[in-house]
Protein backbone atom coordinates (compact mmCIF):
# COMPACT_ATOMS: atom_id res chain seq x y z
CA UNK A 1 0.00 0.00 0.00
CA UNK A 2 1.01 3.60 -0.45
CA UNK A 3 1.01 6.44 2.10
CA UNK A 4 -2.77 6.89 1.58
CA UNK A 5 -3.54 3.24 2.32
CA UNK A 6 -4.32 2.44 -1.33
CA UNK A 7 -3.20 -0.86 -2.82
CA UNK A 8 -0.44 -0.41 -5.37
CA UNK A 9 0.09 -4.01 -6.42
CA UNK A 10 -1.66 -7.32 -5.93
CA UNK A 11 -0.94 -10.81 -7.14
CA UNK A 12 -3.93 -13.13 -7.41
CA UNK A 13 -4.41 -16.50 -9.02
CA UNK A 14 -7.72 -16.02 -10.81
CA UNK A 15 -7.75 -19.48 -12.42
CA UNK A 16 -10.30 -20.76 -9.91
CA UNK A 17 -12.97 -18.62 -11.59
CA UNK A 18 -12.56 -20.64 -14.78
CA UNK A 19 -14.11 -23.59 -12.94
CA UNK A 20 -17.32 -21.62 -12.30
CA UNK A 21 -18.75 -22.49 -15.69
CA UNK A 22 -22.42 -22.22 -16.69
CA UNK A 23 -22.58 -26.02 -16.47
CA UNK A 24 -21.28 -26.00 -12.91
CA UNK A 25 -23.64 -23.17 -11.94
CA UNK A 26 -26.54 -25.08 -13.54
CA UNK A 27 -25.82 -27.97 -11.17
CA UNK A 28 -26.17 -25.55 -8.23
CA UNK A 29 -29.05 -23.46 -9.57
CA UNK A 30 -31.62 -24.86 -7.12
CA UNK A 31 -29.43 -23.80 -4.21
CA UNK A 32 -28.87 -20.35 -5.71
CA UNK A 33 -32.56 -19.83 -6.45
CA UNK A 34 -33.49 -20.83 -2.90
CA UNK A 35 -31.21 -18.15 -1.48
CA UNK A 36 -32.45 -14.64 -0.70
CA UNK A 37 -30.17 -13.11 -3.33
CA UNK A 38 -27.12 -13.82 -5.47
CA UNK A 39 -23.93 -11.73 -5.34
CA UNK A 40 -21.63 -11.78 -8.35
CA UNK A 41 -18.55 -9.95 -9.46
CA UNK A 42 -16.97 -9.65 -12.85
CA UNK A 43 -14.12 -12.00 -12.07
CA UNK A 44 -16.62 -14.66 -13.20
CA UNK A 45 -16.41 -15.69 -16.85
CA UNK A 46 -18.75 -13.65 -19.08
CA UNK A 47 -20.74 -16.74 -20.07
CA UNK A 48 -21.31 -17.59 -16.40
CA UNK A 49 -22.56 -14.08 -15.68
CA UNK A 50 -24.88 -14.37 -18.68
CA UNK A 51 -26.16 -17.77 -17.51
CA UNK A 52 -26.83 -16.52 -13.99
CA UNK A 53 -28.65 -13.44 -15.24
CA UNK A 54 -30.85 -15.56 -17.50
CA UNK A 55 -31.61 -18.30 -14.95
CA UNK A 56 -31.38 -16.82 -11.49
CA UNK A 57 -34.80 -16.06 -9.98
CA UNK A 58 -33.54 -14.10 -6.96
CA UNK A 59 -32.17 -10.53 -7.01
CA UNK A 60 -28.62 -10.26 -8.34
CA UNK A 61 -26.18 -7.83 -6.73
CA UNK A 62 -23.15 -7.09 -8.92
CA UNK A 63 -19.72 -5.63 -8.27
CA UNK A 64 -18.05 -4.54 -11.53
CA UNK A 65 -14.57 -5.04 -9.92
CA UNK A 66 -12.64 -3.07 -12.59
CA UNK A 67 -13.15 -1.26 -15.86
CA UNK A 68 -11.46 -4.11 -17.72
CA UNK A 69 -13.93 -6.65 -16.34
CA UNK A 70 -17.05 -4.45 -16.01
CA UNK A 71 -17.73 -4.86 -19.74
CA UNK A 72 -19.06 -8.33 -18.92
CA UNK A 73 -22.12 -6.66 -17.35
CA UNK A 74 -23.10 -4.62 -20.43
CA UNK A 75 -25.31 -7.32 -22.01
CA UNK A 76 -27.10 -8.10 -18.74
CA UNK A 77 -27.51 -4.76 -16.96
CA UNK A 78 -31.30 -5.03 -17.15
CA UNK A 79 -31.15 -8.22 -15.08
CA UNK A 80 -29.10 -6.70 -12.25
CA UNK A 81 -30.98 -5.67 -9.11
CA UNK A 82 -28.18 -3.75 -7.37
CA UNK A 83 -24.84 -2.57 -8.73
CA UNK A 84 -21.90 -0.92 -6.97
CA UNK A 85 -19.65 0.76 -9.54
CA UNK A 86 -17.03 3.40 -8.96
CA UNK A 87 -16.87 6.44 -11.25
CA UNK A 88 -14.61 4.78 -13.84
CA UNK A 89 -16.77 1.64 -13.98
CA UNK A 90 -19.95 3.74 -14.21
CA UNK A 91 -18.42 5.65 -17.13
CA UNK A 92 -17.68 2.41 -18.94
CA UNK A 93 -21.16 0.99 -18.28
CA UNK A 94 -22.99 4.15 -19.35
CA UNK A 95 -20.77 5.52 -22.09
CA UNK A 96 -20.46 8.97 -20.49
CA UNK A 97 -17.54 10.50 -18.59
CA UNK A 98 -18.23 10.43 -14.84
CA UNK A 99 -16.09 13.07 -13.18
CA UNK A 100 -18.29 14.85 -10.63
CA UNK A 101 -21.64 14.58 -8.86
CA UNK A 102 -23.57 16.01 -11.80
CA UNK A 103 -22.24 13.43 -14.26
CA UNK A 104 -22.58 10.71 -11.60
CA UNK A 105 -26.29 11.58 -11.32
CA UNK A 106 -26.64 11.21 -15.09
CA UNK A 107 -24.83 7.85 -14.98
CA UNK A 108 -27.18 6.63 -12.24
CA UNK A 109 -30.16 7.71 -14.38
CA UNK A 110 -28.79 5.76 -17.36
CA UNK A 111 -28.21 2.61 -15.29
CA UNK A 112 -31.74 2.84 -13.90
CA UNK A 113 -33.15 3.35 -17.41
CA UNK A 114 -31.28 0.20 -18.47
CA UNK A 115 -33.18 -1.76 -15.82
CA UNK A 116 -30.90 -1.77 -12.79
CA UNK A 117 -33.10 -1.39 -9.68
CA UNK A 118 -30.55 0.16 -7.28
CA UNK A 119 -27.25 1.91 -7.95
CA UNK A 120 -24.61 2.73 -5.35
CA UNK A 121 -22.02 4.76 -7.25
CA UNK A 122 -18.84 5.23 -5.23
CA UNK A 123 -17.38 8.72 -5.67
CA UNK A 124 -14.32 8.26 -3.48
CA UNK A 125 -13.89 11.06 -0.94
CA UNK A 126 -17.20 12.60 -2.10
CA UNK A 127 -19.15 9.61 -0.78
CA UNK A 128 -21.70 7.46 -2.57
CA UNK A 129 -24.51 8.44 -4.89
CA UNK A 130 -27.49 6.16 -4.33
CA UNK A 131 -30.29 5.93 -6.85
CA UNK A 132 -33.46 3.95 -7.45
CA UNK A 133 -36.87 4.56 -9.04
CA UNK A 134 -37.83 6.87 -6.16
CA UNK A 135 -34.89 9.23 -6.61
CA UNK A 136 -31.25 9.87 -5.88
CA UNK A 137 -29.33 10.88 -2.79
CA UNK A 138 -25.66 11.52 -2.08
CA UNK A 139 -24.49 9.76 1.05
CA UNK A 140 -21.37 11.46 2.47
CA UNK A 141 -18.49 9.49 3.89
CA UNK A 142 -18.13 9.42 7.65
CA UNK A 143 -14.91 11.09 8.79
CA UNK A 144 -12.36 8.39 9.51
CA UNK A 145 -8.63 7.84 9.58
CA UNK A 146 -7.99 5.57 6.60
CA UNK A 147 -5.16 3.17 7.18
CA UNK A 148 -5.74 0.78 4.32
CA UNK A 149 -8.39 0.69 1.58
CA UNK A 150 -7.88 -2.98 0.69
CA UNK A 151 -11.27 -4.74 0.58
CA UNK A 152 -13.20 -1.52 1.25
CA UNK A 153 -15.41 -2.23 -1.77
CA UNK A 154 -15.99 -5.82 -0.64
CA UNK A 155 -16.98 -4.58 2.81
CA UNK A 156 -19.35 -2.05 1.25
CA UNK A 157 -21.01 -4.75 -0.86
CA UNK A 158 -21.38 -6.92 2.25
CA UNK A 159 -23.07 -4.00 4.02
CA UNK A 160 -25.45 -3.51 1.07
CA UNK A 161 -26.38 -7.20 1.16
CA UNK A 162 -26.90 -7.09 4.94
CA UNK A 163 -29.05 -3.96 4.64
CA UNK A 164 -31.18 -5.53 1.90
CA UNK A 165 -31.65 -8.79 3.80
CA UNK A 166 -32.52 -6.82 6.95
CA UNK A 167 -35.01 -4.72 4.95
CA UNK A 168 -33.30 -1.49 6.02
CA UNK A 169 -34.31 1.66 4.21
CA UNK A 170 -31.56 3.51 2.38
CA UNK A 171 -31.77 6.30 4.93
CA UNK A 172 -31.13 3.82 7.73
PLM features: what roles do these ranges have?
Residues 1, 10-12, 41, 63, ...:
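Short beta-strand segments
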Residues 1-36:
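Conserved N-terminal subdomain of the carbohydrate kinase-like
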Residues 2, 43, 115:
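Conserved functional loop/turn residues at catalytic and ligand-binding sites
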Residues 13-15, 95-99, 144:
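Short glycine-enriched, charge-decorated loop/helix-capping segments at active-site entrances
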Residues 33, 78, 114:
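Structured loop/turn residues at beta-strand edges in well-structured enzyme cores
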Residues 36-106, 126-128:
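Conserved beta-alpha-beta core of the PfkB/ribokinase-like small-molecule kinase fold
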Residues 69-70, 74, 101-172:
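Conserved phosphate-binding/catalytic region of the ribokinase-like
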Amino acid sequence: TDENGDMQLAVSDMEIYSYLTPEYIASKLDVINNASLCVIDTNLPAETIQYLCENCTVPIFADPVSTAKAVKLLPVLGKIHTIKPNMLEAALLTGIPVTDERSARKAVDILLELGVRQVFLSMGAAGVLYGNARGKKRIPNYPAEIRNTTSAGDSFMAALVMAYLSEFSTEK
